[in-house]
Amino acid sequence: MSPHRAVIEAGPGAIRRLCCGADVVADTAVSAAALAAIDDQVALLDERPVAVDSLWFDALRSVAVDHRDGPVVVHPSWWSAARVEVVTAAARTLTRDVVVHPRSWLLRQASSGVSAATVVVEIAERLVLVAGAEVAAVARRTDAESVAGQVGSVIARMTRGITAVVLIDVPSTVAGAAFCGGSPRTRSWRCSQFITEPAQCRSAMRSTRGAC
């Protein structure tokens, strides 16, 4: 039994535990159904209707085992309040001692020892979220080069006159994220650091108090 909190990634493309040196992944069918139907009340699992909150409970329970304290649940920063509430409510059926953070919070731990300002770039299926002194979203409606150029302009505006570290989140579970994040236009995002989970997410968690 680990004395630390389990750190659980809830989305964008998987539900899994990131701490303790190895991935523990929720059942693929259950997690896929839970993520796909997070905006609904009922989902189909093996062609049968299942309550979405039940799917989230099962998925979170399977990856939170063997940890004494309540979990730290990390969700995509661009999720709506309603989506976050679905995950939070499911986690609280496991234990009332639950801590919920956006993904940008976890990624910022990677630069916790740096004095410069931090900007987090999260690449999602349909948008790129830029979180710094403010939060902005760039739609992924055009090619990767154009999107990278637009994101670079947003970063330049946010960091005008200051030194900043740019953390680029490139989830392996998001289609096209690696190509978008690896675009030549990203070279203009100065002081950039790519976070390709889960290994580098674990590095970030080492500075997270109370996690494995």
Give the location of each predicted region.
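C-terminal single-pass membrane-anchor helix
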Residues: 206-212
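A generic structural signal for short coil/turn motifs at secondary-structure boundaries
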Residues: 76-79, 174
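Short, charged, surface-exposed secondary-structure boundary motifs
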Residues: 110-111, 202-204
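Small-residue (GG/TT-enriched) beta-loop-alpha framework at ligand/catalytic clefts
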Residues: 84-176, 184-193
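Conserved phosphate-binding loops in N-terminal lobes of ATP-dependent enzymes
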Residues: 1-75, 82-91, 136-160
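Short beta-strand/turn micro-motifs composed of small residues
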Residues: 74-77, 168-169
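Helix N-cap / beta->alpha transition motif
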Residues: 28, 51, 102, 193-196
